[in-house]
């Protein structure tokens, strides 16, 4: 008997790439996933929520929807998910004619996506209380749908 406990989790953005991975897992084209987790910013287009409902209707691997709150509300309040500093979204500054346009600093992916999914894995999948260590012999593989043109966004495996 193996002492290794494995979990296979799909970070589901409900876009083309993560949807393809979800469907491939449903049909056995890739390793089966135990859960798909959608981090809801509360500001996704209606078509994303409709698509998410369609995916759920396929009765494939369970899809968890988790949220850190509504990004737009935090932006209007000038606060982030912890109630401190600013809510940083990806946006661009408007420039006068001929001037260079810049992008503001952004952190929403970390606060509204990455941390939400990591918390769901730790609490909902592994059943861990906050600040508890993952038990020895437990391995979590996360699947991300990233296309070739987005490869610079991909990061290496971390222990």
Predicted features along the sequence, with ranges:
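ATP-dependent adenylation/nucleotidyltransferase module used to activate substrates
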Residues: 1-159
């Amino acid at each position: 008997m193996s002492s290794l406990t494995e979990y296979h989790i799909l970070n589901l953005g409900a876009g083309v790439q993560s949807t393809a991975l979800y469907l491939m897992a449903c049909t056995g084209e890739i390793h089966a996933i135990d859960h798909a987790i959608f981090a809801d910013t509360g500001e996704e287009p209606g078509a994303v929520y409709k698509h998410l409902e369609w995916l759920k209707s396929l009765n494939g691997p369970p899809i968890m929807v988790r949220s850190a709150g509504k990004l737009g509300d935090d932006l209007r309040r000038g606060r982030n998910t912890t109630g401190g500093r600013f809510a940083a979204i990806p946006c661009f500054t408007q420039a006068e004619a001929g001037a260079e346009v810049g992008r503001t600093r952004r952190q929403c992916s970390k606060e509204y996506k990455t941390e939400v999914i990591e918390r769901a894995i730790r609490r909902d999948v592994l059943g861990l209380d906050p600040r508890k260590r993952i038990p020895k012999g437990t391995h979590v593989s996360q699947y991300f749908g990233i296309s070739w043109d987005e490869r610079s966004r991909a990061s290496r495996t971390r222990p």
